[in-house]
Swiss-Prot record:
Name of the protein described by the UniProt record: GDP-fucose protein O-fucosyltransferase 2
Function: Catalyzes the reaction that attaches fucose through an O-glycosidic linkage to a conserved serine or threonine residue in the consensus sequence C1-X-X-S/T-C2 of thrombospondin type I repeats (TSRs) where C1 and C2 are the first and second cysteines of the repeat, respectively. O-fucosylates members of several protein families including the ADAMTS, the thrombospondin (TSP) and spondin families.
GO BP, sorted A to Z: fucose metabolic process; protein O-linked fucosylation
Compartmental location: Endoplasmic reticulum; Golgi apparatus
Organism phylogeny: Eukaryota, Metazoa, Ecdysozoa, Arthropoda, Hexapoda
Amino acid sequence: MRGSWPRLGFPALLLLLHLLTGSDAAVRNGTAKREIGDSRGSSGTCVKGFLQEILPLPATCPPEVLGMRGAVYILYDVNISEGFNLRRDVYIRMAVFVRRLQRRRRFRHVRLVLPPWPRLYHWHSQGLQQSGLPWSHFFDLASLRRYAPVLDYEEFLAEQRLFGNPGAPLVHVGHAFRLQHYEVMLEQGIFRDKFERVTDKPCSEGSLSGGPLLQQAELRVGRFHCVRFQGSAGLLEKLLREAIDEDTAGPEDVDDMRTYALLSAETVLHDHWGDEHFWQARRSMRFARRLEQVAADFRRQALDTTDASAGVQRPAMWELERPKRNAKGGDYLCAHLRRGDFVRSRDATTPTLKAAAQQVKQLLRGFNMTTVFLATDATPYELMELKELFYRFRLVHFAPESNVQRRELKDGGVAVVDQLVCAYARYFVGTYESTFTYRIYEEREILGFTQASTFNTFCKALGGSCSRNAVWPIVWADGDSDSEEDSDPY
Protein backbone atom coordinates (compact mmCIF):
# COMPACT_ATOMS: atom_id res chain seq x y z
CA MET A 1 0.00 0.00 0.00
CA ARG A 2 1.28 3.45 -0.93
CA GLY A 3 1.48 6.19 1.68
CA SER A 4 3.77 8.33 3.74
CA TRP A 5 4.03 6.00 6.75
CA PRO A 6 7.58 5.01 7.62
CA ARG A 7 8.55 1.37 7.31
CA LEU A 8 8.12 -0.19 10.72
CA GLY A 9 8.93 -3.71 11.68
CA PHE A 10 6.26 -5.98 13.13
CA PRO A 11 7.60 -5.67 16.74
CA ALA A 12 7.51 -1.87 16.46
CA LEU A 13 3.89 -1.96 15.31
CA LEU A 14 2.97 -4.18 18.26
CA LEU A 15 4.67 -1.74 20.65
CA LEU A 16 2.82 1.19 19.08
CA LEU A 17 -0.54 -0.58 19.43
CA HIS A 18 0.19 -1.42 23.08
CA LEU A 19 1.10 2.16 23.95
CA LEU A 20 -1.97 3.59 22.23
CA THR A 21 -4.42 1.26 24.00
CA GLY A 22 -2.72 1.74 27.36
CA SER A 23 -2.84 5.51 27.08
CA ASP A 24 -6.51 5.44 26.11
CA ALA A 25 -7.43 3.27 29.08
CA ALA A 26 -5.57 5.52 31.48
CA VAL A 27 -7.41 8.58 30.24
CA ARG A 28 -10.77 6.82 30.51
CA ASN A 29 -10.34 5.90 34.16
CA GLY A 30 -9.00 9.35 35.06
CA THR A 31 -5.68 8.10 36.42
CA ALA A 32 -3.36 9.13 33.63
CA LYS A 33 -2.29 12.29 35.34
CA ARG A 34 -2.82 11.61 39.03
CA GLU A 35 -0.41 8.64 38.93
CA ILE A 36 2.36 10.89 37.71
CA GLY A 37 3.94 12.66 40.66
CA ASP A 38 5.34 15.55 38.63
CA SER A 39 2.82 17.75 36.83
CA ARG A 40 5.35 19.47 34.59
CA GLY A 41 4.44 17.49 31.50
CA SER A 42 0.75 18.07 31.93
CA SER A 43 0.33 21.52 30.48
CA GLY A 44 2.05 22.03 27.17
CA THR A 45 1.24 24.51 24.48
CA CYS A 46 0.48 21.47 22.29
CA VAL A 47 0.36 17.82 23.25
CA LYS A 48 3.48 16.21 21.76
CA GLY A 49 3.48 12.49 22.48
CA PHE A 50 5.87 9.75 21.71
CA LEU A 51 4.26 9.41 18.28
CA GLN A 52 6.33 12.31 16.97
CA GLU A 53 9.44 10.23 17.61
CA ILE A 54 8.05 7.41 15.49
CA LEU A 55 5.74 9.01 12.93
CA PRO A 56 6.23 12.26 10.99
CA LEU A 57 3.06 13.93 12.38
CA PRO A 58 2.29 17.49 11.28
CA ALA A 59 2.05 20.32 13.80
CA THR A 60 -1.45 20.27 15.36
CA CYS A 61 -1.60 23.54 17.30
CA PRO A 62 -4.40 25.75 15.94
CA PRO A 63 -3.57 29.45 15.58
CA GLU A 64 -5.73 30.39 18.58
CA VAL A 65 -3.59 28.12 20.78
CA LEU A 66 -0.27 29.35 19.42
CA GLY A 67 -1.37 32.85 20.36
CA MET A 68 -1.94 31.78 23.97
CA ARG A 69 1.53 30.60 24.88
CA GLY A 70 2.08 31.05 28.58
CA ALA A 71 -1.63 31.18 29.47
CA VAL A 72 -2.27 31.07 33.22
CA TYR A 73 -5.79 30.18 34.37
CA ILE A 74 -6.69 31.27 37.90
CA LEU A 75 -9.73 29.50 39.29
CA TYR A 76 -11.11 30.71 42.60
CA ASP A 77 -13.94 30.01 44.99
CA VAL A 78 -15.51 31.39 48.16
CA ASN A 79 -16.57 29.71 51.40
CA ILE A 80 -19.90 27.98 50.86
CA SER A 81 -21.52 29.95 53.71
CA GLU A 82 -20.97 33.34 52.05
CA GLY A 83 -23.84 35.05 50.25
CA PHE A 84 -24.35 36.50 46.80
CA ASN A 85 -23.36 40.08 47.58
CA LEU A 86 -20.18 39.26 49.50
CA ARG A 87 -19.16 37.08 46.54
CA ARG A 88 -19.54 40.10 44.29
CA ASP A 89 -17.09 41.97 46.49
CA VAL A 90 -14.62 39.07 46.37
CA TYR A 91 -14.87 39.16 42.57
CA ILE A 92 -13.79 42.82 42.61
CA ARG A 93 -10.72 41.93 44.70
CA MET A 94 -9.74 39.24 42.22
CA ALA A 95 -10.58 41.26 39.08
CA VAL A 96 -8.51 44.27 40.16
CA PHE A 97 -5.62 41.93 40.97
CA VAL A 98 -5.78 40.08 37.63
CA ARG A 99 -6.13 43.30 35.63
CA ARG A 100 -2.83 44.49 37.07
CA LEU A 101 -1.25 41.04 36.93
CA GLN A 102 -1.68 40.79 33.16
CA ARG A 103 0.79 43.66 32.77
CA ARG A 104 3.51 41.25 33.88
CA ARG A 105 5.21 39.45 31.03
CA ARG A 106 4.71 35.95 32.48
CA PHE A 107 1.03 36.65 33.09
CA ARG A 108 0.26 38.46 29.83
CA HIS A 109 -2.29 35.73 28.99
CA VAL A 110 -3.78 35.32 32.46
CA ARG A 111 -7.46 34.38 32.75
CA LEU A 112 -9.68 34.68 35.83
CA VAL A 113 -12.13 31.78 35.81
CA LEU A 114 -15.49 32.59 37.41
CA PRO A 115 -16.74 29.79 39.68
CA PRO A 116 -20.20 28.30 39.07
CA TRP A 117 -22.70 29.60 41.62
CA PRO A 118 -23.62 26.94 44.18
CA ARG A 119 -27.03 26.90 45.83
CA LEU A 120 -26.64 29.67 48.38
CA TYR A 121 -28.03 29.84 51.89
CA HIS A 122 -30.55 32.57 51.03
CA TRP A 123 -32.02 30.80 48.01
CA HIS A 124 -34.91 29.03 49.72
CA SER A 125 -37.33 28.31 46.87
CA GLN A 126 -37.98 24.67 46.15
CA GLY A 127 -38.38 23.13 42.72
CA LEU A 128 -35.84 25.43 41.04
CA GLN A 129 -32.48 24.48 39.57
CA GLN A 130 -30.26 26.79 41.62
CA SER A 131 -26.87 25.11 41.70
CA GLY A 132 -24.03 25.31 39.21
CA LEU A 133 -25.36 28.55 37.71
CA PRO A 134 -23.05 30.40 35.31
CA TRP A 135 -22.10 34.02 35.90
CA SER A 136 -23.84 34.90 32.65
CA HIS A 137 -27.13 34.19 34.43
CA PHE A 138 -26.56 37.28 36.59
CA PHE A 139 -23.99 39.49 34.86
CA ASP A 140 -23.11 40.88 31.45
CA LEU A 141 -19.86 39.03 30.71
CA ALA A 142 -18.94 41.36 27.86
CA SER A 143 -19.04 44.24 30.33
CA LEU A 144 -16.90 42.34 32.85
CA ARG A 145 -14.36 41.49 30.15
CA ARG A 146 -13.87 45.11 29.22
CA TYR A 147 -12.30 45.51 32.64
CA ALA A 148 -10.54 42.21 33.32
CA PRO A 149 -9.77 38.98 31.39
CA VAL A 150 -12.48 36.73 32.80
CA LEU A 151 -14.04 33.48 31.62
CA ASP A 152 -17.23 31.80 32.70
CA TYR A 153 -16.57 28.22 33.79
CA GLU A 154 -17.93 26.65 30.60
CA GLU A 155 -15.81 29.04 28.52
CA PHE A 156 -12.79 27.92 30.52
CA LEU A 157 -13.53 24.27 29.71
CA ALA A 158 -13.87 25.15 26.03
CA GLU A 159 -10.43 26.81 26.02
CA GLN A 160 -8.94 23.81 27.80
CA ARG A 161 -10.22 21.55 25.04
CA LEU A 162 -8.25 23.63 22.55
CA PHE A 163 -5.09 22.52 24.33
CA GLY A 164 -6.31 18.91 24.35
CA ASN A 165 -4.68 18.37 27.69
CA PRO A 166 -4.54 16.02 29.59
CA GLY A 167 -7.37 14.29 27.80
CA ALA A 168 -10.40 16.54 27.38
CA PRO A 169 -12.78 17.00 29.04
CA LEU A 170 -10.56 16.42 32.11
CA VAL A 171 -8.65 19.48 33.30
CA HIS A 172 -5.40 19.27 35.24
CA VAL A 173 -5.09 21.83 38.05
CA GLY A 174 -1.40 22.04 38.87
CA HIS A 175 -1.82 23.41 42.40
CA ALA A 176 -4.89 24.14 44.52
CA PHE A 177 -4.44 26.46 47.51
CA ARG A 178 -6.98 26.71 50.31
CA LEU A 179 -6.34 30.01 52.06
CA GLN A 180 -6.68 30.30 55.84
CA HIS A 181 -6.34 33.09 58.35
CA TYR A 182 -3.42 33.16 60.74
CA GLU A 183 -4.43 32.34 64.30
CA VAL A 184 -2.43 35.35 65.51
CA MET A 185 -2.80 38.18 63.00
CA LEU A 186 -0.68 40.90 64.62
CA GLU A 187 3.07 40.80 65.22
CA GLN A 188 3.87 43.16 68.08
CA GLY A 189 0.73 45.06 67.24
CA ILE A 190 1.57 45.31 63.51
CA PHE A 191 -0.40 43.73 60.65
CA ARG A 192 2.02 42.36 58.04
CA ASP A 193 1.32 40.90 54.59
CA LYS A 194 2.57 37.30 54.60
CA PHE A 195 1.72 33.72 53.71
CA GLU A 196 3.07 30.25 54.39
CA ARG A 197 2.11 26.74 53.38
CA VAL A 198 0.71 24.71 56.27
CA THR A 199 2.91 21.75 57.17
CA ASP A 200 2.10 21.27 60.86
CA LYS A 201 -1.56 20.27 60.45
CA PRO A 202 -3.49 17.89 58.20
CA CYS A 203 -4.99 19.49 55.10
CA SER A 204 -8.11 17.82 53.70
CA GLU A 205 -8.77 18.19 49.99
CA GLY A 206 -12.32 16.88 50.40
CA SER A 207 -13.51 19.69 52.70
CA LEU A 208 -16.01 22.15 51.22
CA SER A 209 -14.99 24.95 53.57
CA GLY A 210 -13.12 26.79 50.82
CA GLY A 211 -15.96 26.40 48.34
CA PRO A 212 -17.30 23.52 46.22
CA LEU A 213 -15.22 24.33 43.12
CA LEU A 214 -13.10 21.18 43.27
CA GLN A 215 -16.28 19.08 43.22
CA GLN A 216 -16.58 19.90 39.52
CA ALA A 217 -16.27 16.56 37.73
CA GLU A 218 -13.78 17.83 35.14
CA LEU A 219 -11.08 18.99 37.56
CA ARG A 220 -8.10 16.85 38.56
CA VAL A 221 -5.81 18.41 41.17
CA GLY A 222 -2.11 17.66 41.07
CA ARG A 223 -1.06 19.12 44.43
CA PHE A 224 -3.28 20.43 47.20
CA HIS A 225 -2.03 22.88 49.82
CA CYS A 226 -3.44 24.70 52.81
CA VAL A 227 -1.92 28.17 53.05
CA ARG A 228 -2.03 30.64 55.90
CA PHE A 229 -2.59 33.95 54.17
CA GLN A 230 -2.70 37.51 55.44
CA GLY A 231 -2.71 40.47 53.12
CA SER A 232 -4.07 42.01 49.95
CA ALA A 233 -4.60 40.36 46.59
CA GLY A 234 -1.24 41.52 45.23
CA LEU A 235 0.46 39.01 47.53
CA LEU A 236 -1.09 36.22 45.44
CA GLU A 237 1.39 36.97 42.66
CA LYS A 238 4.24 35.65 44.79
CA LEU A 239 2.23 32.52 45.62
CA LEU A 240 1.54 31.89 41.93
CA ARG A 241 5.14 32.50 40.89
CA GLU A 242 6.33 29.93 43.41
CA ALA A 243 3.91 27.39 41.90
CA ILE A 244 5.07 28.19 38.36
CA ASP A 245 8.71 27.75 39.40
CA GLU A 246 7.90 24.34 40.90
CA ASP A 247 6.19 23.29 37.67
CA THR A 248 8.97 24.47 35.37
CA ALA A 249 11.62 21.86 34.58
CA GLY A 250 13.61 23.93 32.14
CA PRO A 251 13.58 26.57 29.39
CA GLU A 252 11.49 24.37 27.10
CA ASP A 253 8.39 24.58 29.32
CA VAL A 254 8.72 28.10 30.72
CA ASP A 255 5.78 29.20 28.56
CA ASP A 256 3.59 26.15 29.14
CA MET A 257 -0.06 26.68 30.00
CA ARG A 258 -0.78 26.56 33.75
CA THR A 259 -3.96 26.17 35.78
CA TYR A 260 -4.20 26.98 39.49
CA ALA A 261 -7.04 27.21 42.02
CA LEU A 262 -7.46 29.56 44.99
CA LEU A 263 -10.06 28.50 47.54
CA SER A 264 -11.52 30.65 50.34
CA ALA A 265 -10.67 33.73 48.29
CA GLU A 266 -12.65 35.88 50.73
CA THR A 267 -9.52 35.64 52.92
CA VAL A 268 -7.77 38.01 50.50
CA LEU A 269 -8.07 41.75 51.15
CA HIS A 270 -8.59 44.49 48.56
CA ASP A 271 -5.52 45.93 46.87
CA HIS A 272 -7.45 49.12 46.10
CA TRP A 273 -10.55 49.35 48.24
CA GLY A 274 -12.68 52.40 47.52
CA ASP A 275 -10.37 54.06 44.97
CA GLU A 276 -10.83 54.50 41.21
CA HIS A 277 -9.61 50.95 40.49
CA PHE A 278 -12.23 49.49 42.83
CA TRP A 279 -14.94 51.63 41.27
CA GLN A 280 -13.96 50.80 37.70
CA ALA A 281 -14.30 47.11 38.52
CA ARG A 282 -17.59 47.78 40.29
CA ARG A 283 -18.97 49.81 37.39
CA SER A 284 -18.09 46.98 35.00
CA MET A 285 -20.39 44.64 36.95
CA ARG A 286 -23.45 45.38 34.84
CA PHE A 287 -26.23 42.89 35.41
CA ALA A 288 -27.37 40.54 32.66
CA ARG A 289 -29.51 42.42 30.16
CA ARG A 290 -32.38 39.99 30.69
CA LEU A 291 -32.53 40.92 34.40
CA GLU A 292 -32.17 44.63 33.68
CA GLN A 293 -35.09 44.42 31.27
CA VAL A 294 -37.32 42.69 33.83
CA ALA A 295 -36.49 45.43 36.35
CA ALA A 296 -37.08 48.19 33.78
CA ASP A 297 -40.46 46.74 32.81
CA PHE A 298 -41.50 46.48 36.47
CA ARG A 299 -40.41 50.06 37.25
CA ARG A 300 -42.34 51.35 34.27
CA GLN A 301 -45.52 49.36 34.91
CA ALA A 302 -45.71 49.38 38.73
CA LEU A 303 -43.92 52.63 39.58
CA ASP A 304 -44.27 54.75 36.43
CA THR A 305 -40.50 55.24 36.30
CA THR A 306 -38.07 55.16 33.38
CA ASP A 307 -34.42 56.12 32.94
CA ALA A 308 -35.49 59.46 31.50
CA SER A 309 -38.05 60.31 34.18
CA ALA A 310 -35.64 59.26 36.95
CA GLY A 311 -32.86 61.39 35.46
CA VAL A 312 -30.21 58.69 35.91
CA GLN A 313 -27.19 58.02 33.73
CA ARG A 314 -27.14 54.58 32.12
CA PRO A 315 -25.08 54.69 28.90
CA ALA A 316 -24.70 51.51 26.88
CA MET A 317 -21.13 51.04 28.16
CA TRP A 318 -19.92 51.67 31.69
CA GLU A 319 -16.81 53.37 30.28
CA LEU A 320 -19.04 56.24 29.14
CA GLU A 321 -20.31 57.04 32.65
CA ARG A 322 -19.27 60.39 34.09
CA PRO A 323 -19.45 62.11 37.50
CA LYS A 324 -23.05 63.07 38.22
CA ARG A 325 -25.02 64.15 41.30
CA ASN A 326 -28.40 65.31 40.01
CA ALA A 327 -30.35 62.09 39.51
CA LYS A 328 -33.97 62.58 40.58
CA GLY A 329 -35.33 59.06 40.92
CA GLY A 330 -38.85 57.74 40.61
CA ASP A 331 -41.74 58.96 42.72
CA TYR A 332 -41.28 56.28 45.37
CA LEU A 333 -39.12 55.43 48.36
CA CYS A 334 -37.25 52.14 48.57
CA ALA A 335 -36.67 50.34 51.84
CA HIS A 336 -34.42 47.32 52.18
CA LEU A 337 -35.56 45.56 55.32
CA ARG A 338 -33.37 42.60 56.20
CA ARG A 339 -35.04 39.88 58.22
CA GLY A 340 -34.11 36.18 58.43
CA ASP A 341 -30.98 35.54 60.48
CA PHE A 342 -30.54 39.29 61.16
CA VAL A 343 -33.53 39.20 63.52
CA ARG A 344 -31.67 36.68 65.69
CA SER A 345 -27.99 37.52 65.21
CA ARG A 346 -28.27 41.34 64.99
CA ASP A 347 -31.17 42.05 67.28
CA ALA A 348 -29.48 45.17 68.71
CA THR A 349 -29.59 46.99 65.36
CA THR A 350 -32.44 45.33 63.43
CA PRO A 351 -35.83 47.04 63.87
CA THR A 352 -39.09 45.25 64.42
CA LEU A 353 -41.63 45.37 61.61
CA LYS A 354 -43.60 48.04 63.48
CA ALA A 355 -40.49 50.18 64.11
CA ALA A 356 -39.41 49.91 60.47
CA ALA A 357 -42.89 50.88 59.26
CA GLN A 358 -42.92 53.92 61.56
CA GLN A 359 -39.60 55.15 60.15
CA VAL A 360 -40.65 54.64 56.53
CA LYS A 361 -44.00 56.40 57.00
CA GLN A 362 -42.24 59.36 58.58
CA LEU A 363 -39.96 59.59 55.53
CA LEU A 364 -42.89 59.28 53.11
CA ARG A 365 -44.68 62.17 54.79
CA GLY A 366 -41.49 64.24 54.79
CA PHE A 367 -41.01 63.78 51.05
CA ASN A 368 -44.74 64.04 50.27
CA MET A 369 -44.80 60.57 48.72
CA THR A 370 -47.29 57.74 49.07
CA THR A 371 -45.46 54.75 47.56
CA VAL A 372 -42.82 52.55 49.14
CA PHE A 373 -41.08 49.72 47.32
CA LEU A 374 -40.02 47.02 49.78
CA ALA A 375 -37.04 44.75 49.18
CA THR A 376 -36.99 42.14 51.91
CA ASP A 377 -36.46 38.51 52.78
CA ALA A 378 -39.46 38.62 55.10
CA THR A 379 -41.71 35.59 55.36
CA PRO A 380 -45.17 35.63 53.72
CA TYR A 381 -46.70 36.14 57.17
CA GLU A 382 -44.42 39.13 57.83
CA LEU A 383 -45.35 40.61 54.44
CA MET A 384 -49.03 40.42 55.36
CA GLU A 385 -48.28 42.22 58.63
CA LEU A 386 -46.33 44.93 56.78
CA LYS A 387 -49.20 45.52 54.36
CA GLU A 388 -51.48 46.14 57.34
CA LEU A 389 -48.94 48.56 58.86
CA PHE A 390 -48.91 50.56 55.58
CA TYR A 391 -52.67 50.54 55.10
CA ARG A 392 -52.82 54.27 54.25
CA PHE A 393 -49.89 54.06 51.87
CA ARG A 394 -49.10 52.05 48.76
CA LEU A 395 -46.73 49.16 49.45
CA VAL A 396 -45.13 47.60 46.35
CA HIS A 397 -43.18 44.35 46.36
CA PHE A 398 -41.72 42.51 43.36
CA ALA A 399 -42.71 38.91 42.72
CA PRO A 400 -42.34 36.92 39.47
CA GLU A 401 -45.45 37.26 37.36
CA SER A 402 -45.57 33.56 36.48
CA ASN A 403 -43.96 30.22 37.27
CA VAL A 404 -42.14 30.47 33.96
CA GLN A 405 -40.56 33.76 35.02
CA ARG A 406 -39.77 32.37 38.48
CA ARG A 407 -37.91 29.43 36.92
CA GLU A 408 -36.09 31.82 34.60
CA LEU A 409 -35.05 34.37 37.24
CA LYS A 410 -34.52 32.02 40.20
CA ASP A 411 -34.10 33.44 43.70
CA GLY A 412 -30.86 35.21 42.83
CA GLY A 413 -32.44 36.94 39.85
CA VAL A 414 -35.39 38.14 41.95
CA ALA A 415 -32.91 39.72 44.39
CA VAL A 416 -31.13 41.44 41.49
CA VAL A 417 -34.44 42.94 40.30
CA ASP A 418 -35.06 44.19 43.86
CA GLN A 419 -31.70 45.96 43.83
CA LEU A 420 -32.29 47.53 40.43
CA VAL A 421 -35.67 48.88 41.53
CA CYS A 422 -34.20 50.29 44.76
CA ALA A 423 -31.39 51.90 42.77
CA TYR A 424 -33.90 54.13 40.93
CA ALA A 425 -35.89 55.31 43.97
CA ARG A 426 -36.13 58.97 45.00
CA TYR A 427 -34.84 58.01 48.44
CA PHE A 428 -33.34 54.82 49.84
CA VAL A 429 -33.03 53.45 53.36
CA GLY A 430 -31.24 50.17 54.07
CA THR A 431 -30.28 47.75 56.81
CA TYR A 432 -27.25 48.17 59.04
CA GLU A 433 -24.23 46.07 57.93
CA SER A 434 -26.12 44.32 55.13
CA THR A 435 -24.10 43.62 51.98
CA PHE A 436 -27.38 43.77 50.02
CA THR A 437 -27.76 47.37 51.20
CA TYR A 438 -24.10 48.12 50.39
CA ARG A 439 -24.53 47.01 46.78
CA ILE A 440 -27.55 49.32 46.39
CA TYR A 441 -25.51 52.21 47.80
CA GLU A 442 -22.89 51.52 45.12
CA GLU A 443 -25.44 51.28 42.32
CA ARG A 444 -26.98 54.61 43.27
CA GLU A 445 -23.55 56.26 43.43
CA ILE A 446 -22.93 55.12 39.85
CA LEU A 447 -26.36 56.30 38.66
CA GLY A 448 -25.72 59.80 40.00
CA PHE A 449 -27.84 60.26 43.14
CA THR A 450 -26.94 62.56 46.01
CA GLN A 451 -25.33 61.00 49.05
CA ALA A 452 -28.14 62.32 51.26
CA SER A 453 -30.72 60.32 49.29
CA THR A 454 -28.62 57.15 49.35
CA PHE A 455 -26.57 56.48 52.50
CA ASN A 456 -29.43 56.00 54.95
CA THR A 457 -29.88 53.27 57.54
CA PHE A 458 -32.80 51.89 59.54
CA CYS A 459 -32.53 52.57 63.26
CA LYS A 460 -33.51 50.05 65.89
CA ALA A 461 -36.40 52.32 66.86
CA LEU A 462 -37.79 55.66 65.74
CA GLY A 463 -36.08 58.46 67.64
CA GLY A 464 -33.64 56.17 69.41
CA SER A 465 -29.87 55.83 69.20
CA CYS A 466 -28.83 54.62 65.79
CA SER A 467 -25.87 52.79 64.30
CA ARG A 468 -25.39 53.92 60.71
CA ASN A 469 -23.56 52.47 57.76
CA ALA A 470 -20.44 54.29 56.63
CA VAL A 471 -20.47 56.59 53.59
CA TRP A 472 -18.02 55.73 50.83
CA PRO A 473 -18.55 57.94 47.77
CA ILE A 474 -17.66 56.91 44.25
CA VAL A 475 -14.21 57.87 42.96
CA TRP A 476 -13.79 58.78 39.29
CA ALA A 477 -10.67 58.86 37.14
CA ASP A 478 -10.11 60.25 33.66
CA GLY A 479 -8.28 57.07 32.67
CA ASP A 480 -6.37 54.13 34.03
CA SER A 481 -3.40 55.14 36.12
CA ASP A 482 -2.32 51.63 37.02
CA SER A 483 0.27 51.20 34.26
CA GLU A 484 3.74 50.36 35.47
CA GLU A 485 7.02 49.10 34.11
CA ASP A 486 7.32 45.33 33.94
CA SER A 487 10.52 44.24 35.60
CA ASP A 488 9.89 40.50 35.33
CA PRO A 489 12.93 38.42 34.39
CA TYR A 490 10.74 36.09 32.29
